[in-house]
Amino acid sequence: RYEEPVIKERDAHNRFPATSSVAYKSGFLNRPIVDEYVEILWACMKLLWPGIQRKQHSYRVFLSHDVDRPFFVYDQSWHQIFRNIAGDLTIRKDLSLALQRIKCKVRNDSTLDPANTFDFIMDLSEKYDLKSEFYFMTDHTAGSLDGSEYSIESLQITKLMHRIYERGHRIGLHGSYNSFSNPQQIKKEFERLMKTTEKLGIKQDSWGGRQHYLRFENPITWQSWEDAGLNYDSTLGFADNIGFRCGTCHEFPVFNLETKRVLHLR
């Protein structure tokens, strides 16, 4: 991502926009251009060395979900709920949603919460023999921009995380809004996740996640994740367009442009 430190355009959330990229301007953002170059190189190599063998890769699907707001009702005060109900009735014109909020709060039952779709997502993932990853926030550095200010140590969230793990799915970090350029904050948030999962007996062979709002600064964000002990990052998509921000559909080792060093982070 050499162009990102060089080109200075940023959007309202200080993100490098797809529209400023060479790929978008040249019309190949929706093509994995690096992978296409590899295929051309391989075709040339086969002509020169017909007996050469190539490592075969299998296709895999990785499903990941940012947990910005785990519940709409369960962890809210009546004041917040009535404000949302007013919006349901006057803006969204959805009486059933308003009634569902009241029912969930009165019964104190998170399974009735309209935002509680975790089991639905896991059921659907398992139907197709897939594992889902759920990225939790462990700190909220920007108030409402970070969704609902839930606590990762709360009983409801720890029960949810343990249920995800018991069903064979994965837990990860969703870095808060202001953490992307703050190495100390990323370290703090990941340590909090590790402390909580350790208490719950959650063990994984690797840990990853994604930055909130896809906020990213090269090379600070990647280096911060590496230094904090994370193994992989899935932030590198664009917020304003779909496409291949890194020009590939394969995972790859990260390169720090300042230190000229390949990182362990992928």
List each language-model region with its residue ranges.
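Conserved hydrophobic/aromatic pocket- or pore-lining residues that grip, position, or stack substrates
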Residues: 66, 174, 225
